[in-house]
Amino acid sequence: PEAAKAPFKDVLGDPVAWAKKCVDEYNAQAIVLQLKSTDPNDKDASAEDAAQTVKKVSEAIAVPLIVWGCAVPAKDSDVLKKISEVCDGHNLILGPVEEKNHKAIGAAAMGYGHTIISSSPIDVNLAKQVNILLENLGVSLDKVIVDPTTGGLGYGLEYSYSVMERLTQAAMTQGDDKLQNPMINNLGNEVWKCKEAKQPVEEAPELGDPERRAILMEAVGAVSYLMSGSSILIMRHPESIKLAKAFIELV
């Protein structure tokens, strides 16, 4: 939606400038580089091209860099392995790493000193299983962040929230050392692609101003995930982030 693009309209074609703007103007505490162009069903950009872009962004900022693949396991395996190699020692955070590609990405991340985002489809047992597989491979669990899969407002959020509560209870109450990891939620990606975030006021007058609506959807989602134990929120709109930070300061 245009509302999501507006704060970055002067840098949309330049990932390095975009990242620097997020840090310098909007005080981003970390940067997330979402590798949409590598999707085989989209531009199918090469692993080498993606790696060079990641390296340039990493060298241009002084905050942590999270690299999020296209969620096609085979392509992510190739791309994230190459990024691990090209960005040796940059201590990137790489994901999503699933059961299907954990060996290739896990080995590369270990070899080149990166952190991993273990991803599973809204299920406590599957989240634990991916962590066990990574640990069996030799990955230290203190280099793993858990992505339980994130839904936007509605049923998706409720499912994700419920699973995150159970993950937290298993880790803290039951002492399950395979689940005592920080959790990450790729919230902005889900909120801004949903129908309600894009509908103009002519189509849905009862939902109010489209820009404000989507900003509030993202902020409400952020607060919900914070309450369920999230450690890292990936958000898109600066105003949504301000609202989420205001909530944190109240706690």
Describe every region a protein language model picked out.
Residues 11-23, 79, 216-224:
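Short, acidic/polar
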